[in-house]
């Protein structure tokens, strides 16, 4: 079971705690009574799609009866018992024909939305989250993956193994700022960096210690090879070294090195796109990316990037 499902249980227990408080159960009642009453209230909310949707709608703000009628695609008569049930549970308040959440109703609806968002993210991309090593993501951010919103997993087939990176790079070129964490180097990244810098895009790159040491080794005087296993760059060594130093000296590029803790294979965050690639649970490289364009995902991704940047050191030369 993934680590963040432990937080689902914490969220569930948190919800139970609030419900127990709201129903004014006496402290001297035994635990079975508390659990039974709480579970009954959970059933009242989650086993009714109408009541659940009503709570989520009222979370947006008070609504008149006419607004409620227009919001749902079923007869108003069928909504009356659902509203009455929520009023009886002290989750909804009716004042002069206007319905709103009580204080505890707001608390419960907020936590319910949080849980539903998290479950949706997991359910829609279950293979990605269950088959990859999530330990490189700090737990406080892992518990907030519901903020990623609408995501999709990009899976390159063997005949177009580099197409995913190409598609992501095209989106990056349309951005005004770029943040990248790199745990494995590839010649395509070198070429992409040149394009970013030429387009005056502000670029911040975090390299893992091993990647940085690999680049330094290639630039040693006695080195006679650059990316010896792939000849994409077609650069001689002096030219390659010159371009590496150009990257480091450029005003709109900022480089950092991060050692120690485990990192994602690749993290890309811009003002347009969020993309994340992780090792699988066996420590193997996986070329799949989870991608989102939603504002919440961009913010979440930037927080993850800043987490690694905080524990990194700037570099200006090899």
Could you describe each region identified by the protein language model?
Residues 2-120:
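Basic, Lys/Arg-rich alpha-helical nucleic-acid-recognition elements, primarily the DNA-binding modules
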Residues 302-318:
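Cysteine/selenocysteine-centered motifs that mediate thiol-based redox chemistry or coordinate metal-sulfur cofactors
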Residues 168-240:
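Primarily the HKD phosphodiesterase
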Residues 252-295, 305:
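HKD (HxKxxxxD) catalytic microenvironment of the phospholipase D
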Residues 145, 242-250:
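Short, conserved catalytic or adaptor-binding loops enriched in Gly and charged residues
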Residues 61, 183-187, 261:
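Short beta->alpha connector loops
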Residues 38, 161-165, 189-190, 240, ...:
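Amphipathic coiled-coil/heptad-repeat helices and related helical stalk/stem segments
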Residues 116-176:
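Amphipathic alpha-helical dimerization/coiled-coil segments
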């Amino acid at each position: 079971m993934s680590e963040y499902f432990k937080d689902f249980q914490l969220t569930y227990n948190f919800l139970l705690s609030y419900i127990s408080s709201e129903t004014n159960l006496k402290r001297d009642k035994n635990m079975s009574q508390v659990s039974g009453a709480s579970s009954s209230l959970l059933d009242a909310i989650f086993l009714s799609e109408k009541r659940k949707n009503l709570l989520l709608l009222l979370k947006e703000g008070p609504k008149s009866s006419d607004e409620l009628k227009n919001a749902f695609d079923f007869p108003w008569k069928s909504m009356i018992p659902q509203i009455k049930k929520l009023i009886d549970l002290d989750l909804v308040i009716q004042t002069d024909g206007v319905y709103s959440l009580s204080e505890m109703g707001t608390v419960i609806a907020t936590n319910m939305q949080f849980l539903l968002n998290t479950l949706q993210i997991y359910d829609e991309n279950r293979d990605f989250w269950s088959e990859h090593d999530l330990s490189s993501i700090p737990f406080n951010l892992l518990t907030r993956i519901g903020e990623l919103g609408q995501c999709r997993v990009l899976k390159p087939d063997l005949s177009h193994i580099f197409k995913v990176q190409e598609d992501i790079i095209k989106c990056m070129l349309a951005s005004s700022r770029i943040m990248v964490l790199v745990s494995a180097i590839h010649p395509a990244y070198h070429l992409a960096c040149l394009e970013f810098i030429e387009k005056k895009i502000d670029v911040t790159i975090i390299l893992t210690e091993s990647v940085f040491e690999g680049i330094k080794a290639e630039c040693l005087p006695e080195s006679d090879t650059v990316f010896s296993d792939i000849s994409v760059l077609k650069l001689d060594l002096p030219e390659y070294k010159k371009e590496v130093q150009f990257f480091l000296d450029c005003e709109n590029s900022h480089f950092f090195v991060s050692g120690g803790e485990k990192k994602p294979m690749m993290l890309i965050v811009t003002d347009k796109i969020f993309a994340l690639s992780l090792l699988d649970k066996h420590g193997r490289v996986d070329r799949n990316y989870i991608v989102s364009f939603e504002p919440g995902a961009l913010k979440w991704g930037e927080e993850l990037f800043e987490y690694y940047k905080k524990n990194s050191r700037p570099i200006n030369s090899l």
